[in-house]
């Protein structure tokens, strides 16, 4: 087993950890934090279960699933290894969840993140929801213990962003940092791993989630006026230009350009999502916005020249599913094909979902409301982690 694990960790270090996020930087926590914790887990696993052991198995599982996908799902040995380490990671995570109040470091929070990474790489459906719910519950517990802000901030930002983007309700006390006007939370779009996701975007998306929760209610004239104001704010909140880098700092400059294109892709996807899901606009009415968003996705790849990792997939899902004509749909097919080099199964499942939405709209007499990606992604076969 050690020789097989060594191969998996080698792949994690050289490929998976670098591709699981859009931009691989020197401070990538997938290496700087997870690897030391995984080492502790490897050394201590004979003594019993702990969060570090869960991290070790999660890294091995992610790497094995990644290798299996990169082999076009032909290497059965990698699949068997992936399932073994996946089961071990979940076993140790659950065991330590029962002792969550005993944890005094970041290892359990990182174990949750490592297991969510497994779900993304493997494309396993539905189970990711348990990890996100558990992460929010653990965050609530940590915050109630009055821990120092420095111990909470990174995990809170990570979990709250993830939950909002995945449509989870988040308690007000956990997302209060989004309304912080002191400037401490500015520039979120430049931080790992949610490149391109600004504080204002998260606030707006959280509000859209609440609109969708209340969608069955008949709005009053005052509520319609508030909705009009909110819609106008969405349109006006165009992403600003990234900070100017020194002319010689080529990599930094490239990363800033990539982040700007990513922010703009989120901007257009957010408008499309609002129009289609809250305003119930027809597909034809959002095609200008969709095309602009697809251009941003293409620009990210052009700037990255094949060296980037995986973009957060929410704008891809929204923009891809709302492509209304064959030309735009073909551009999205090409985009998805280019991402297969990453070996992440959730991309494959979302590509299939998008194509299913397109086909559903071509059926004679099809209701556009029924052929919405939100209806399809609720089905077990498509409910993958979409970030």
Regions found by a protein language model. Give the residues of each.
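Extended C-terminal subregions enriched in glycine
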Residues: 306-310
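Residue-level recognition of the N-termini of beta-strands and the immediately preceding loop/turn
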Residues: 106-107, 156, 348-351
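Hydrophobic/aromatic-rich effector regions of fungal transcription factors
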Residues: 36-46, 58-75, 84-125, 135-141, ...
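Central/C-terminal regulatory/activation regions of fungal transcription factors
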Residues: 3-35, 79, 120-293, 377-387
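Short alpha-helical linear motifs
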Residues: 132-136, 179-180, 313-316, 354-362, ...
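Acidic, Ser/Thr/Pro-rich intrinsically disordered transcriptional activation regions
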Residues: 1-58, 62, 69-78, 243-247, ...
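Short coil/turn linker motifs that delimit alpha-helical repeat modules in TPR/alpha-solenoid proteins
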Residues: 52, 104, 152, 258-260, ...
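Residue-level signal for threonine
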Residues: 105, 198, 344
């Amino acid at each position: 087993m050690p020789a097989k694990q060594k191969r998996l960790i080698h792949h994690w270090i050289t490929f998976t950890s670098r591709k699981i996020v859009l931009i691989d930087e020197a401070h990538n926590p997938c290496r700087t934090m997870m690897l030391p914790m995984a080492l502790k887990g490897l050394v201590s696993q004979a003594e019993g279960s702990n969060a570090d052991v869960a991290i070790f198995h999660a890294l091995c599982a992610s790497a094995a699933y990644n290798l299996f996908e990169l082999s076009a799902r032909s290497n059965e040995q990698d699949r068997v290894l992936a399932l073994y380490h996946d089961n071990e990671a979940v076993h140790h995570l659950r065991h330590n969840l029962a002792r969550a109040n005993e944890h005094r470091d970041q290892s359990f929070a990182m174990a949750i993140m490592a297991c969510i990474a497994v779900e993304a790489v493997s494309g396993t459906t539905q189970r990711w929801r348990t990890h996100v719910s558990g992460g929010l519950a653990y965050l609530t517990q940590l915050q109630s213990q009055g821990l120092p802000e420095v111990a909470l901030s990174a995990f809170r930002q990570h979990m709250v962003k993830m939950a909002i983007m995945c449509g989870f309700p988040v308690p007000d006390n956990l997302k209060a940092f989004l309304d912080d006007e002191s400037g401490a939370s500015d520039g979120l779009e430049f931080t790992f791993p949610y490149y391109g996701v600004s504080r204002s975007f998260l606030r707006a998306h959280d509000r859209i989630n609440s609109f969708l929760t209340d969608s069955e209610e008949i709005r009053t004239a005052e509520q319609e006026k508030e909705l009009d104001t909110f819609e106008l704010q969405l349109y006006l909140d165009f992403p600003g230009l990234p900070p100017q880098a020194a002319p010689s700092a080529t990599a930094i400059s490239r990363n800033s350009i990539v982040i700007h294109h990513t922010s703009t892709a989120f901007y257009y996807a957010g408008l499309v999502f609002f129009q289609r899901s809250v305003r119930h606009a027809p597909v034809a009415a959002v095609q200008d916005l969709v095309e602009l968003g697809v251009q941003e996705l293409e620009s990210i790849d052009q700037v990255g020249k094949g060296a980037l990792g995986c973009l957060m997939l929410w704008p891809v899902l929204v923009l891809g599913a709302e492509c209304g004509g064959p030309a735009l749909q073909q551009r999205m097919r090409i985009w998805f094909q280019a991402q297969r080099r990453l070996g992440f199964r959730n991309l494959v499942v979302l590509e299939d979902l998008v194509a299913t939405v397109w086909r559903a709209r071509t059926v004679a007499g099809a209701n556009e409301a029924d052929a919405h990606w939100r209806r399809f992604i609720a089905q077990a076969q498509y409910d993958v982690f979409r970030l």
